[in-house]
Curated annotation (Swiss-Prot):
One GO cellular component term: cytosol
GO molecular function: ADP binding; ATP binding; phosphoglycerate kinase activity
The EC number(s) this enzyme carries: 2.7.2.3
EC supergroup of this enzyme: transferase
InterPro entries: Phosphoglycerate_kinase (IPR001576), Phosphoglycerate_kinase_CS (IPR015911), Phosphoglycerate_kinase_N (IPR015824), Phosphoglycerate_kinase_sf (IPR036043)
Official protein name in the record: Phosphoglycerate kinase
Organism of provenance: Mycobacterium marinum (strain ATCC BAA-535 / M)
Amino acid sequence: MTIHSLEDLLAEGVSGRGVLVRSDLNVPLDENGVITDAGRITASVPTLKALLDGGAKVVVAAHLGRPKDGPDPKLSLEPVAAALGEQLGRHVQLAGDIVGTDALARAEGLTDGDVLLLENIRFDKRETSKDDGERLALAKQLAELVSPGGAFVSDGFGVVHRKQASVYDVATLLPHYAGRLVADEIRVLEQLTSSTERPYAVVLGGSKVSDKLGVIESLATKADSIVIGGGMCFTFLAAQGYSVGTSLLEKEMIDTCRRLLDTYHDVLRLPVDVVVTEKFAADSPPQTVAADAIPADTMGLDIGPGSVKRFAALLSNAKTIFWNGPMGVFEFPAYATGTRGIAEAIVAATGKGAFSVVGGGDSAAAVRALGISEGSFSHISTGGGASLEYLEGKTLPGIEVLGRPQPGQTEGGGPA
C-alpha cells in the first residue's frame, strides 16, 4: 500500500492552497477548563508548521471529548486554540461553528500562512454517524472550506481507527496525504509487527481486560512475555482462584482469563504482590500484600515492589518493548510506584539498545505526569486505541483510505 506523505504535498507546492488537516487535539482539561497535558497539541505542531511555513491556508478539524447532544460549552476548543497558537507562534482563529456561516467566512478570508481551527467537530452528530450518507454530507462541506484546489492531511493518529467524516470520508473527496505524525506512527508500528527483534516484551495495564483482549490474543503468539498489571490484573488473579477483595473485577471475563492463562501460561506474567487500601482515595494508606492474600475489605490500586523487581528483570533482557496502560492509579502518588518502576525499567532497557514504544493513552500521560523524559523512550504514540487495533491486525479506516488512489486517478496512478 502506497501512502502519499506530507513531503509529497510540500513538493507539489502549498503556497496559496487550502489544506484541511485532521489533527488529534483531544487533550485533558481540569474542572476549570485548563489543559492538564498538552502532549497531543505539541505532537500536532510539526505538520501544521510545515504547511504554514509553506504558505498554505490551513483549516484544522479536531475533537474534544465526547459531546452527547450537540454543542457543549465545556468541550469548546477555545482553550486548545490558545495553546496551539502559543506553540505555533502565531494567532489561531477559532470558528464559532464547524461548516456554518462563520467557518465559511473565516476560511474564505484566510491568507497565505493563516490557520483556522474549526469548533469541536463532534458537535456535529454527522461526524460519528453510522450512516454513510450523513458522514459524506459533512465531509463534502468540510472539503468546500479548502476548495477549489484543496488537499487533506491526516495527522490525528489517535482517531485513524474511527470511520468518521473528518477522518475517513473527506479523504475520499480530496487529494490525501499522511501528516508527519501519522507517517511516523505507521513506521514505528510496522517495525513492531514485521521486524521485531527478540526477546519481545509487552507490558499491558489499564482497568479492563475486555479492552485489551484482542491485543493479548494477537501478541501472545508473537511476544516472548506479556506482563499484566493495572486494574485488569485482578480479573486474571480471580481466574487463578484468588480472592481480590473489593478490587476492580470483570466477573464476565474470568472464564476468558482462565482460558488465556491455560493457553499462554508460558507467556503471561502476573503480579506476585499488590498494593491495597480500604478506599479509593489519594490519602487512603497503602499496604503491600501477596497477590494471593488480598484482604476482603481492601482494593488493589497498584502492583507491589516484588512485582516491579521481577518485571524489571524481565524487561532488562528485552530487545523490543511495547507498553500500553499504567500499572496502577498513578494519579495518586502513593499508588504510582508500580508505573514509575516499570517506566524506569523500560528507560534503562532503551538505554542499552532496546526499541521501546509507549502505546499512547494513559501510559503516555503517566510518563509526562511522573516527570520522565519522553526522549528516554524510542517512541511515544499519540493513539492508544489505534495502536492496539493496529497490533491486533485490524484494518484502520483512516489508514486504509490514505492508501487509495487520489481522486480522479486509477490504481496505476493515471487519470481515471
